[in-house]
């Protein structure tokens, strides 16, 4: 996507942000007061359902407020941080607390992810608040809250590596539990799960030397590839797979190459070109990554032990076998 040619002047951005945040604060107050009133009146389940329907316009309004702040933030990046400190932060810090409705916590999480991702190291002062919240909400009952939380953990692991380092192991534990849940790949949970898989890969990439269970985390991560719901996550994880095969070979494939079949299956699925989970197909890897995969598969055809190659070959379906053989040099067979 090309950068916008028009940049909203900072003075105007300041005024817009002030007005938007004031309106967001009033919207949050209206919702919390309504929830408090409902609790005092002893609303039953049906009453709360009706109240939630009444909140739909407030939820849409708040989403628009958050999007507006996000657009302005991404325009000005680190220059926006003083405005963020003055207007969005005082409004959204309280909304990140557990007693708030999930939609408000989600709004707050999204805006703090944006500032950490786009406003430079000066924004990292919010990590001490945001990271514990993200870890807590990664297990939320609502999948959209989990998805935002694990995305935030991924962004923090890459953008704020020093501060994130103390959270590496507990975060990996949370993500592994999420990914391995029995219902993790059903339709309602797929996006949150794939974001968790992407987060595991990113953490292993940037913090691998500090992970004493890397030999367990990488195969778990790889077993959930390819990702198919979100193109950005799919392409990123495909790139990470190639990088790990080159730099963490034995950690990924196992000391006896016991995980080689998982790697071959993931790469051939990507090369076959699986469709995404939505209405439109997504590109699971960039052209360069696909080229790298073809080279890696050709190398594996000549370097893997025969038993590992045979096991990998037997695990493939017809389309995967066809694409695998098509990328090998003339005369080279993958099956020994």
Regions found by a protein language model. Name each.
Residues 1-336:
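Karyopherin-beta/Importin-beta family HEAT-repeat alpha-solenoid scaffold
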